């Protein structure tokens, strides 16, 4: 039996809309310490991972831990109906193959989402160390990716001691965007290397997917030479949402 009340229903909508850019269905784990999920896209280019601790909920009761297979189109259709002041109540009874979602404000609206059977194998999180870590404004990152998409199908992240660049070039032209702490777009910036430049390139389509996160207050950007990109978003309600994206195979 699972019963939980989350204070901001729309934050759940933002979370699962972002997850659905990478996967169509996911197994969500309800454990005594919180809610989590991790999945990889079909092309094995990107991984999504999120965690919501139990103390983020107004009430949280898990008598029996469970992994719930959810079709994201079905869940998002419901979560899109949340309004600004709605709380979200979640309930699951093992005898029923469904998740009950109720929006609670002046009136109570209750929806039932049927669950699906999914394998219980969760992909392991790679143990990666990064030479560059930056805390950035999420909207600025999203707009930078859109700017790069105007001229190219990939973006190169390049770190210098005092600035992070996102750039690209193609037969259509070139683009370069500079992020610094002085500009206000970087809240923190660390380069743990004495190399002159650290760079890696990533496909623009996936970058557009993993930077279109609504409601986030900050994003941590981590990368190394020709290594997977890690984006970790902090969403209100103590929700942590992370993406890993493989570098381009022909990255130089």
Segments (PLM) and residue ranges:
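DNA polymerase sliding clamps and clamp-related checkpoint/processivity subunits
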Residues: 1-20, 25-150, 158-252
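Phosphate/anion-contacting hairpin/loop surfaces
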Residues: 155
């Amino acid at each position: 039996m699972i019963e939980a009340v989350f204070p901001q229903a729309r934050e759940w909508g933002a979370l699962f809309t972002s997850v659905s850019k990478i996967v169509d269905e996911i197994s969500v784990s309800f454990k005594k310490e919180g809610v989590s999920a991790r999945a990889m896209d079909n092309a094995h280019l990107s991984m999504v991972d999120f965690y919501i601790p139990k103390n983020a909920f107004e009430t949280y009761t898990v008598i029996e831990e469970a992994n719930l297979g959810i079709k994201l189109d079905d869940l998002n259709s419901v979560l899109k109906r949340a309004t600004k002041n709605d709380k979200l109540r979640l309930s699951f009874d093992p005898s029923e193959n469904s998740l009950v979602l109720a929006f609670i404000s002046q009136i109570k609206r209750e929806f039932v989402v049927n669950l699906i059977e999914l394998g219980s194998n969760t992909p392991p999180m790679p143990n990666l160390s990064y030479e560059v870590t930056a805390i950035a404004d999420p909207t600025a990152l999203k707009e930078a990716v859109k700017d790069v998409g105007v001229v190219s199908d990939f973006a190169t992240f390049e770190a210098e001691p005092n600035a992070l660049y996102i750039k690209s070039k193609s037969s259509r032209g070139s683009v370069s965007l500079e992020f610094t702490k002085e500009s206000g777009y970087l809240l923190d910036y660390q380069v743990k290397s004495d190399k002159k430049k650290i760079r890696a390139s990533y496909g623009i389509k996936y970058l557009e997917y993993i930077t279109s996160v609504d409601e986030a207050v900050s994003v941590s950007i981590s990368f190394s030479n020709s290594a997977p990109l890690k984006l970790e978003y902090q969403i209100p309600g103590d929700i942590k949402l992370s993406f890993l994206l493989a570098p381009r195979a022909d990255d130089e």
